Amino acid sequence: YRLCDENGILVWQEFIQSSSGIDNKPSEQEEFLELLKKTAECAVREKRNHVSLAVYSGGNELMETPDRPCGRENKNIAMLEEIVRRLDGRRAFLPTSASGPREFVTSEKGVSHDVHGSWRYEGNPGHYVLYGESDNLFHSEFGMDAASCEKSLKKFLPRASLHPTPMSQDPCWQHHGEWWGTYFRDCEMFGSIEKTPENLGLFTRCSQYMQG
């Protein structure tokens, strides 16, 4: 925060809630709300004097139903907004990120004020059509998966796993990157990549090229 204050970098501060594909809807149980209230009040008091702080959010990808972000009608979100207004009062508050009205990027018109996704390459021309046709006002999270560089992989993978592979065929790769396997994508784009230790560097470069 100090460095952001000094360098003019605006901060989007989320409270410590995230769906992560487990519990998309934030808890409204009284016991949880009491704990959340205490931590949220401490967080606002600690951060509110930083000039870099621009906006608060209830959390990451909180959804009432699939593809529909939580709104202020949720008791959890309503409580956090009240805390922000009472203890800060100068900053904007968004129920969650993305704030919708749709959660994920889409070519459908008029429903993409603030969206997330996608995180994988959608192919040519589909990927570029989707991004080009979306009329979102703010694409607040998106990305592309890729393998780590060869030097990094050698720091945590056992020798027997230091070769190109689909995630499903090696438990060590799977443990570290279950969602983000790119082997088949990269073979489709660049041609067959043999699963030999000598090709590890080639594989990571191809993977990162697609990410870029």
Regions found by a protein language model. Name each.
Residues 22-26, 108-109, 151-154:
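Surface-exposed beta-strand edges and their flanking turn/coil or helix-capping segments
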Residues 56, 84-85, 120-212:
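Substrate-binding clefts and catalytic carboxylate motifs of secreted carbohydrate-active enzymes
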Residues 1-104:
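Active-site mouth of glycoside hydrolases
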Residues 8, 74-76, 112-115, 156-164:
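Short, low-complexity, polar/charged sequence segments that are solvent-exposed and flexible
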Residues 68-75, 98-137, 145-151:
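Substrate-binding cleft/loops of secretory-pathway carbohydrate-active enzymes
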